[in-house]
A protein has these predicted regions:
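The feature captures the beta-strand-to-loop junction immediately N-terminal to the Walker
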Residues: 33-35
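Helix-to-loop junction immediately C-terminal to a conserved catalytic motif
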Residues: 48
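Q-loop/switch helix immediately C-terminal to the Walker
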Residues: 79-96
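Conserved ABC ATPase "signature" region
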Residues: 94-109
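Conserved ABC ATPase signature
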Residues: 113-121
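Hydrophobic anchor residue at the start of the ABC signature
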Residues: 127
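Catalytic Walker B motif of ABC-type/P-loop ATPase nucleotide-binding domains
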Residues: 138-142
């Protein structure tokens, strides 16, 4: 289990999280929900070690075993769909590429470059690349942005089967209702009562 206790995060004079506490179960999918700008992405960045809280503690995270899907896809325009996966997989695991593409419903796109992908396809590729890391914790920032809902729900079922906990950000009601746990963030400065 991951425990966050009394996290306070500020940027200059602006406090985004104010003594915020919560737990992430050791398995399953936990969703973060709330309006834009309330601290969801900041919270993921703190858990990934990319931002330092001003105060508070995070327990139960092994930094090198954490995978973060950024809010933007960060695809390399000169690399094919397949190469985006082989770039993060050791050569001994390249045989997994077809299954990884199937997970993201990208079969047949192996030799396609990012410029030829739709926004939803690019997002699914970024998600497949993140999941290929086989982490102990997945932090997913809007993993289904631009993905049609029926496809997102199919991929969602595969996320729920992962052996590691997933903490994701979503605004989609159907995704939130399918989560094992939902943490509502209602606006800065976010605080636990």
């Amino acid at each position: 289990m991951i425990r966050c206790r009394d996290l306070t995060v500020s940027f200059g004079d602006r406090t985004v999280l104010d003594r915020f506490s919560f737990d992430v179960p050791a398995a399953g999918v936990t969703a973060l929900s709330g309006p834009s700008g309330c601290g969801k992405t900041t919270l993921l960045r703190v858990l990934a070690g990319l931002e330092k809280p001003r105060s508070g503690a995070v327990e139960g995270i092994v930094p090198r075993q954490t995978a973060l899907l950024f809010q933007d896809d960060r695809l390399l325009p000169w690399r094919t769909v397949e190469q985006h996966l082989t770039d993060v997989l050791p050569k001994s695991r390249w045989g997994e590429v077809p299954a990884r593409l199937a997970l993201a419903e990208l079969e047949g796109e192996e030799h396609t470059f990012p410029a030829a992908l739709s926004g939803g396809m690019g997002r699914r590729l970024a998600l497949a690349r993140c999941l290929a890391l086989e982490a102990g914790l997945y932090l997913l920032d809007e993993p289904f942005a631009g993905v049609d809902l029926p496809r997102a729900l199919r991929i969602w079922e595969r996320l729920k089967a992962l052996p590691a906990p997933v903490l994701l950000v979503s605004h989609e009601p159907a995704i939130l209702s399918a989560a094992d746990t939902v943490i509502e963030l209602d606006g800065p400065p976010l605080r636990t009562c």
